[in-house]
A protein has these predicted regions:
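Acidic donor-binding/catalytic loop of UDP-sugar-dependent glycosyltransferases
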Residues: 49, 98-113, 389-393
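Acidic donor-binding segment of Leloir-type glycosyltransferases
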Residues: 26-71
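Short aromatic/hydrophobic "clamp" motif used to bind/position activated sugar donors
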Residues: 93
Length: 493
């Protein structure tokens, strides 16, 4: 391996004690021949004496940079990290938060991993990130005598303690730590411990500084790394420990995260960013895998598409109409619609090319940017019956907001074919588990499905026409018109 320089960028704000411990562990790195490191600390206006602590470390590192920036209304993690990026001179950039500890071989492992594959981005396994010492049991960490040489072993033990492990652990194991197998590897990005090749960082650009407060800036950064063809890897050997500290301003952080999630969707306006607004948790990939594989026209056959097309004649009147859930250009053309939402990328490409006079967007329809009452009619097909009921509710509510009338066009005479459950060879016994409900009661079921890179996927729901119509009657002030496969020309409220 040729010489490699690894730059650590550490943003900090009033965490002098945590920063000191983190720098102590970095100072204990045992560097192999040809590996060098620099440490860049960016102080975002601390008032707790951080500068005095940092001055003590200038002589402990061969390359050390400390920059202080006065706090103002635009202070944020993104701006602080971007300032660090401009100061860094390494071939590899490692982003660490204050109080994140790494073992003595961390730098060597990072250098070796990225030498193997220059486009690789490392998501470092991290323990303790969600632990709050004011609420959680700290005895698992208190029992440990933590040192730079035993940190990986400590992380391994702590990861076995409920609440202490990395929440990405399950999806990483399911994909043999190759997160590029996922539909949305960027959704798991956390810059509290992430390594990026400097050249790839330059291609992707720095952090989006419109993300003020807390949340989403690292996910958006990882999204652009994904667009720059990064290969994402969950790194276990070069692991990290987040020293637990009190979670301050919880409500403020929650509001900030919600605002930043909305900004993320405004910036991209695609199905994944839309799902982040509608579904809390790290299971976006399970839902996206289903949406990417879904082709209602193929599943239900030619007769289904004919029934849909016959229903289109009722709205081909030139009025502003939005279609949701039609993935065939020929079928969609029968509606004369002005707008159409495509729920997966493959359909989006076909529909956009096949309908040049129609405005096609890559969206589910649960969180759109249309004004209230923008459409004369929104037509929703059997597609809504395949979604989890919580997402179906979101689609109906949004349709009621943006349209003067909503039509449920149900042309499927039977339920769709279920994917055959074929567990991987290593699985001797198939057990279906349902994770604990999220805060809003949303829960997901998973099943093993065949595929080279696919381990889990949200199952296919099939709500009856009556169930969806009942939801519409409850959620929409004027109800919805429903057309069924058995009686496709008779409309009923």
């Amino acid at each position: 391996m040729s010489s490699v320089k690894v730059s650590y960028i550490i943003p900090t704000y009033n965490f002098k004690d945590l920063l000191k411990t983190g720098l102590d562990f970095l100072a204990a790195q045992r560097l192999d021949a040809g590996v060098e490191m620099e440490v860049v600390v960016i102080d975002d206006g601390s008032s707790d004496g951080t500068h005095q602590i940092v001055n003590d470390y200038a002589e402990r590192f061969a390359h050390f940079v400390y920059v202080y920036r006065a706090r103002d209304e635009r202070s944020c993690r993104s701006r602080t990290r971007n300032l660090g990026i401009r100061q860094a001179s390494g071939d590899v950039v490692v982003f660490l938060d204050s109080g994140v500890l790494v073992g003595e071989q961390f730098t060597n492992i990072v250098a070796a991993r990225l030498a193997e594959l220059p486009s690789r981005v490392l998501y470092h396994r991290i323990a303790g990130l969600e632990v709050d010492p004011q609420q959680d049991d700290m005895s698992p960490l208190q029992r440990e005598r933590l040192t730079p040489d035993n940190l990986p072993a400590v992380v391994e033990r702590l990861s076995a303690v409920p609440g202490w492990g990395d929440e990405r652990e399950g999806v990483a194991r399911a994909n043999a730590d190759d997160l590029s197998r996922l539909v949305l590897p960027w959704a798991y990005g956390m810059t509290c411990a992430m390594s990026v090749p400097a050249e790839l960082l330059r291609q992707a650009g720095g952090f989006e500084e419109r993300f003020l407060g807390w949340g989403c800036e690292d996910v958006e950064f990882a999204l652009r790394l994904h667009q720059a063809k990064a290969v994402f890897h969950f790194e276990r050997e070069a692991c990290a420990l987040h020293l637990p500290h009190p979670k301050a301003h919880t409500k403020k952080h929650s509001r900030s995260h919600a605002d930043n999630a909305i900004l993320l969707h405004k910036l991209y306006g695609i199905v994944p960013t839309e799902l982040m607004l509608m579904y809390p948790g790290l299971f976006f990939d399970a839902i996206m895998l289903k949406l990417q594989s879904l082709q209602t026209g193929v599943w239900f056959g030619a007769a289904y598409k004919q029934r849909l097309a016959s229903g289109g004649a009722f709205w081909a009147d030139g009025a502003r109409t939005l279609l949701i859930g039609i993935d065939d250009p020929d079928c969609a053309r029968c509606f004369g619609a002005t707008h159409l939402l495509a729920y997966n990328e493959e359909s989006f490409g076909h529909l956009r090319n096949g309908l040049p006079d129609c405005s096609v967007s890559y969206s589910l329809g649960g969180r759109t940017f249309f004004a209230d009452g923008y459409f004369a009619t929104v037509v929703i097909t059997d597609f809504i019956r395949l979604l989890h009921p919580a997402l179906a509710v979101q689609l109906l509510r949004e349709a009621g907001r943006i349209a003067k009338s909503v039509v449920l066009l149900f042309a499927a005479a039977a339920s769709p074919p279920q994917p055959k459950v074929v567990p991987p060879a290593i699985v001797k016994r198939l057990i279906t588990l349902e994770p604990a409900p999220a805060e809003d009661g949303f829960s997901i079921e998973y099943a093993f499905v065949p595929g080279n890179h696919r381990a889990v996927m949200e199952r296919y729901y099939w709500s009856s026409a009556e169930e969806i119509a009942e939801l519409a009657a409850r959620l929409l002030p004027a109800g919805a018109w429903t057309l069924s496969a058995s009686d496709p020309v008779e409309a009923q409220v």
